[in-house]
Amino acid sequence: TLDYAHTAPTYGLPGGKWVMSSLMVDDGIHDDGPLMTTAFEYKDGKRDRHEREFLGFGEVITKNLDTEKENALYRKSVQKYDVSGYYTQGNLVNASVEDAAGKVYTETRNEYDGYYLTAKGDEYTFTAQPVLCSDRASAFVPLRYTANLQYEGAAQGMITSEAWNEYYLTGHHGELKSYKFSNKGKLGSKGDGKFDYQTSIRYTSNSSRNILGLPTDVTVTGGDGKVYHQVSAVYDTKYPNHLTKITQQLGNGEAVTD
């Protein structure tokens, strides 16, 4: 059963918004436990007056209710989104799982970069821009850093894993250039700390046929500097996704597929 409600009008979202307020699932078997009921709460709705567009809610709370205890809250997940502007709308910046008392158990933090895009033919250049605000510019807002934390009810969380992304910003199209991963909590949001492994990617394109971003080399390097895995590919770029050869590292040798 779905239920809907209308949010209260605010300065950020005049007129409010019709939203799903609850979801009840009845599996038809009534002697094996209670019905599953989930309630939803929405905060910080934003309408861009300049663009005349709804940018979303800044916070969405999903509440798991105990139907055997008069729908008492026993767990909730909180998702926070960037609704500060047209270019960043919908970017998830924080997600957490909390108990009924508000103690955090897990948390995910995301950080993004903002770029203005200029094109010369089919070659793009991305220029870093801390604040994206323009009537005409094209923008690129990729995910740079993700950290996962475990709290288990404690006041301070412990980083259990981190990921950092780097992108091609000149002469390409914003493809992923490098990905770093760490489960030691020492990588950092700038990606300049210790990591477990790094994946580097190279691409080829045929702009005359609008065939772009075909990966030609994927190399996985450990934090110790050793190459642990490598795959290369060759394409007939006259046709989209026409793969002609794959070479994979296999021990001290190679495995080639034509």
Question: Where are the model-predicted features located?
Answer:
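Non-catalytic interaction/targeting regions
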Residues: 1-258
